[in-house]
Amino acid sequence: MGGVNIYAIIESGGKQYKVTPGQLVEVDLFDLAEGDSIELDKVLMLNDGETVTIGSPTVPGAKVTATVAGHIKGDKVFAYRFKAKSRNHKKTGHRQLYTVLTIGEILTGGAAEKPARKPRAKKTNEVTTDGA
């Protein structure tokens, strides 16, 4: 397709997100004002268009910069408790708060791919003719 496919997989709030520059992402609430910038340094995987770097557990030196676009509430989640034969039930609801981030730049920080291992030497079974 014509463009360079740069993306990173980051971790925020115990969840993983695949992000690209310019993308809007809803993550768990950050205590930041709208317009503030944040650096997300838990980069689990990085694809810069040429090489793919997988961290163990994170890619050293890699960062993703983002700005806070706003705060929103998620859909309402209902919890219903019910006990049979006792007319006992209770319905409660909850709306999770999210922060909307605009992904700015994916910085590799000089993250380089590990050098490939050398192939093992092939074992050869030598047959001796003297019977030993």
Curated annotation (Swiss-Prot):
List cellular component terms (GO). cytoplasm; ribonucleoprotein complex; ribosome
Against Pfam families, the record matches this protein to: Ribosomal_L21p
Alphabetically list the UniProt keywords.
Ribonucleoprotein, Ribosomal protein, RNA-binding, rRNA-binding
Question: Which GO BP terms apply?
Answer: translation
- Residues annotated as region Disordered? 112-132
Task: Give a yes or no for keyword RNA-binding in this entry.
Answer: yes
One term of GO molecular function: rRNA binding
**NCBIfam families in the record:** L21
Q: What does the sequence similarity comment in the record state about its family?
A: Belongs to the bacterial ribosomal protein bL21 family.
How it assembles, according to the record, is: Part of the 50S ribosomal subunit. Contacts protein L20.
The protein's role, per its UniProt record? This protein binds to 23S rRNA in the presence of protein L20.
The name under which this protein is listed is: Large ribosomal subunit protein bL21
**What is the protein's species of origin?**
Dehalococcoides mccartyi (strain ATCC BAA-2266 / KCTC 15142 / 195)
